[in-house]
């Protein structure tokens, strides 16, 4: 549940969980990857996950360095949904 998510998960897990959920619901398959076209800002993601914009930026950059996602304005490409989900556990 969302409440359990807020209480028991750290900021990174909440952000990763949110990404996984939204990409699964609204993204489309492109080869082995999932692409989400969106209009969310880092601040929007921060508001939804009860974190700061700086934390969202840090986590997204870390996920990009780990080659789990690629993103630019308006697009998030998840390279491996299973590995992304494992990061949120």
Language model features with spans:
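A small-molecule sensor/coupling module
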Residues: 1-14
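Short amphipathic alpha-helical elements of helix-turn-helix/winged-helix folds
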Residues: 18-22
């Amino acid at each position: 549940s969302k409440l359990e998510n807020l209480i028991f998960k750290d900021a990174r897990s909440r952000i990763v969980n949110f990404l996984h959920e939204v990409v699964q619901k609204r993204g489309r398959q492109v080869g082995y990857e999932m692409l989400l076209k969106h209009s969310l800002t880092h601040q929007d993601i921060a508001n939804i996950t009860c974190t700061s914009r700086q934390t969202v930026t840090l986590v997204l950059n870390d996920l990009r360095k780990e080659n789990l996602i690629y993103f630019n304005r308006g697009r998030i490409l998840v390279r491996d949904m299973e590995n992304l989900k494992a990061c949120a556990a």
